[in-house]
Amino acid sequence: MAVVNTSIPGLSGENPHYIPGYTGHCPLLRFSMGQTYGQVTGQLLRGPPGLAWPPAHRTLLPPIQSPRSPVISKGRLPPRRGHERLSSSIIPGYTGFIPRAQFIFAKNCNQVWAEAMSEFTRRHGEQESHQLPDGAKGEREVEEDQLREAEEPPLKQELAHASPYSMDDTDPHKFFMSGFTGYVPRARFLFGSSFPVLTNQALQEFGQMCSRGRAHKDPKPLSPLPRPTFQNLGLLPHYGGYVPGYKFQFGGTFGHLTHDALGLSITQKQLPA
């Protein structure tokens, strides 16, 4: 007959006890008082089996089993391309998208996922039942559809990609729709109209201004620079402006020096005194 070993690992079998400073857990230690640490732990360790140290055939906690993920048959799921996320089990913390899961509350992750997938597959099956297969149409209906598609005029791609700036002033599409947040020239000077009407007027004014600017090809000559006011007179003291050549003048008053500096020509200023 096999004997179960109930001795505690790391302690002697005759007088088991813990020494002061032991930081491990000793059950029921906090409910014992009036004795030393070694005596209390010795009594607890020598007590009935399972009181402080469970025997080998007993456990403190029941075995923990992980919850099973709900199993959904792969045949019910719609065909998918790429990753088969909908046909695989998920764990709590999954951040991917689960169809219909945002409408289910007060359940754990596995229950929400199972119910959401069942609802999604049911809705998908109903949609497929209402859709007729392509082979159900007669040849005449297919020919009519193809003929109708051929008769439809192609979209004007140039009109769709044309900018209101390049359109003619008489074009009815020369405006920006309400909600446009880009810059519209001359629009800030117009008021009292809807946004399409306002932008149409602004674009027309902008185009007229650009056309007038292109018409004037010859630039206007620049006006001659004005001559100094006090060209032939001396300046008053404390004048804060710039006087060309004044810093090279010495031995006179401010009025005399500025009169001499302003009266001399560039050639005279370059000649040595």
UniProtKB/Swiss-Prot annotation:
Residues 59-85, 123-164 are annotated as: Disordered. Its main location: cytoplasm. Expressed in airway epithelial cells. GO terms for cellular component: axonemal A tubule inner sheath; axonemal microtubule; sperm flagellum. It holds the Pfam family CMI2B-like. The keyword Cytoplasm applies. Residues 123-159 have a biased composition (Basic and acidic residues). Microtubule inner protein component of sperm flagellar doublet microtubules. Microtubule inner protein (MIP) part of the dynein-decorated doublet microtubules (DMTs) in cilia axoneme, which is required for motile cilia beating. Belongs to the CIMIP2 family. It is found in: Cytoplasm, Cytoskeleton, Cilium axoneme; Cytoplasm, Cytoskeleton, Flagellum axoneme. Signal peptide: none annotated. PANTHER family: CAT EYE SYNDROME CRITICAL REGION PROTEIN 6, PROTEIN FAM166B. This is Ciliary microtubule inner protein 2B. Keywords: Cell projection, Cilium, Cytoplasm, Cytoskeleton, Flagellum. GO terms for biological process: flagellated sperm motility.
